[in-house]
């Protein structure tokens, strides 16, 4: 008599992954090849300025080892180096902010940095999936979003990673982890806010995941639920995303 085989249930769990050089702790830090010591990442946006993009870009420069965190925090008083050049390029946007395509043009045309920027906007189609696919590959991203309800909320955040569920070999990402410059310091985490595909209630669309909702470029954009400890949860849509990659100094 042969023994019958019983099917074992697949192990189910939640997972998170974030950019590989980020180190969590009392506050979020990064360890780069260019610096001996770990460096803080977060830059705080003020209550009067519209420079969320500049604060996000400063965090990107720190993470990629292109400038020191403290020097970037003092960029308006710097006379030389990358922080001074960044402030000169972005000073006119400090109160009004900047759109994603203008940001990419400004970095490419005004700053001689070893960066390769890839931009996708909502009009290009497939923005949600493109963003999540890059985060799943471990890329460093920034995105812009707007409120679904009134469009008055328009904001930049740094995408530090993603989150989702897994059952056996099936992995389903459903959350973008972000570092919001208007929020507080990320403590013992690589994010201080997140954008979640609702599983129930308004905007849930049957509890489907990003891959299921974004099968083609013509798919309807996802209404993400933006969750932050300092604000009421709000449905938002991605309007653009930028991928950052290091190149060689010319």
Regions found by a protein language model. Give the residues of each.
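Non-catalytic, low-structured ubiquitin/UBL-interacting segments
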Residues: 1-40, 250
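Generic signature of intrinsically disordered, low-complexity, basic-rich segments
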Residues: 6-8, 54-55, 237
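Noncatalytic regulatory segments and standalone regulatory/sensor domains
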Residues: 162-250
């Amino acid at each position: 008599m042969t023994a019958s085989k019983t099917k074992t249930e697949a192990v189910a769990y939640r997972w998170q992954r974030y950019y590989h050089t980020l180190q969590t702790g009392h506050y979020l830090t990064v360890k780069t090849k260019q610096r001996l010591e770990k460096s803080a990442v977060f830059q705080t946006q003020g209550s009067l300025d519209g420079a969320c993009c500049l604060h996000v870009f400063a965090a990107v420069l720190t993470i990629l080892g292109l400038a020191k965190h403290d020097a970037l925090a003092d960029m308006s008083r710097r006379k030389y180096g990358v922080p001074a050049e960044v402030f000169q390029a972005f000073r006119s946007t400090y109160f009004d902010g900047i759109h994603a395509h203008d940001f990419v043009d400004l970095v490419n045309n005004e700053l001689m940095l070893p960066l390769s920027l890839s931009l996708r906007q909502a009009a290009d189609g497939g923005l949600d999936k493109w963003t999540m696919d890059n985060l799943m590959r471990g890329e460093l991203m920034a995105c812009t979003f707007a409120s679904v309800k009134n469009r008055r909320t328009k904001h930049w955040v740094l995408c530090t990673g993603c989150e989702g569920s897994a059952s056996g070999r099936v992995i389903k990402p459903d959350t973008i982890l972000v570092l919001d410059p208007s929020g507080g310091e990320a403590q013992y985490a690589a994010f201080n806010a997140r954008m979640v595909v609702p599983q129930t209630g308004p905007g849930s669309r049957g509890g489907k995941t990003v891959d299921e909702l974004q099968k083609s470029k013509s798919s309807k954009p996802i209404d993400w639920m933006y969750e932050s400890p300092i604000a009421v949860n709000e449905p938002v849509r991605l309007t653009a995303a930028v991928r950052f990659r290091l190149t060689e100094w010319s």
